[in-house]
């Protein structure tokens, strides 16, 4: 086949999840990205190598990315030859997300700077290095993208996703009462229908490119 679709899973996911998307891309090879990176600076090193090992065997490549997998893709693959992207509940503003988590955990920036890492009661580890990286590496994304967002996403506010959509000329589909994690039968049905709909859409205009 001439085209590959690379699936990039989110936290706690795995490359095998790519199997779900194969029926929608019958004319493509759907490949799960089997990565080990846990931080964006690790993804910055690992993702281009994995991507290029796949891309060299195809004429075109598209990407499906989930949650933090989308953030890693934006951070690490923005300069790659990707024809189109499909983002599911993407994390598009890591600095904002970390700041929100600091509020939830009642942690000040000075405390985080001093301790470097703080374990929260909700299972996440706040990292000073992570916050600094997010600030020092603002995302730039110019690849035609379709985004699926749950109305009740607890990690990314609507205003944040809307700003990203406007800035990148992406399309946005919102599931009423949808969550960050699409996993129920109803949510997966909505996701599948979104994929089908997105496949029929064509970006008429190119995303605004920075000089």
Residue spans for each PLM region:
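Short hydrophobic segments within beta-strands
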Residues: 6-11, 64, 88, 148
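The alpha/beta-hydrolase serine catalytic core
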Residues: 82-201
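Short, surface-exposed alpha-helical segments at coil->helix boundaries
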Residues: 15-22, 41-44, 158-162
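Catalytic nucleophile-loop/oxyanion-hole region of alpha/beta-hydrolase
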Residues: 32-55
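Short, surface-exposed "cap/lid" segments of acyl-processing enzymes
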Residues: 1-38
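Gly/Ala-rich beta-loop-alpha elbow adjacent to hydrolase catalytic centers
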Residues: 64-73
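Single conserved hydrophobic/aromatic residue that forms the stacking wall/gate
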Residues: 202-211
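Aromatic pocket-lining residues of Rossmann-like dinucleotide-binding sites
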Residues: 76-77
């Amino acid at each position: 086949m001439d085209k590959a679709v690379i699936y990039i899973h989110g936290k706690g996911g795995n490359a095998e999840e790519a199997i779900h998307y194969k029926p929608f891309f019958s004319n493509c090879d759907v490949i799960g990205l089997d990565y080990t990176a846990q931080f964006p600076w690790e993804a910055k090193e690992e993702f281009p190598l994995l991507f290029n090992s796949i891309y060299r065997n195809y004429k075109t490549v598209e990407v499906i990315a989930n949650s933090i997998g989308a953030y890693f893709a934006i951070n690490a693959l923005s300069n790659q030859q990707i024809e189109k992207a499909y983002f599911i509940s993407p994390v598009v503003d890591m600095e904002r997300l970390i700041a929100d988590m600091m509020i939830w955990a009642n942690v000040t920036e000075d405390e985080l700077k001093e301790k470097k890492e703080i374990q929260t009661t909700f299972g996440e580890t706040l990292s000073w290095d992570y916050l600094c990286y997010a600030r020092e590496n603002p995302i730039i994304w110019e690849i035609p993208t379709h985004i699926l967002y749950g109305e009740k996403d607890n990690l990314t506010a609507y205003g944040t996703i809307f700003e990203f959509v406007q800035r990148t000329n992406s399309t946005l589909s919102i599931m009423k009462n949808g969550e960050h994690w699409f996993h129920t039968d109803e949510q997966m049905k909505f996701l599948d229908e979104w994929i089908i709909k997105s496949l029929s859409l064509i970006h008429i205009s190119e995303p605004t490119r920075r000089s």
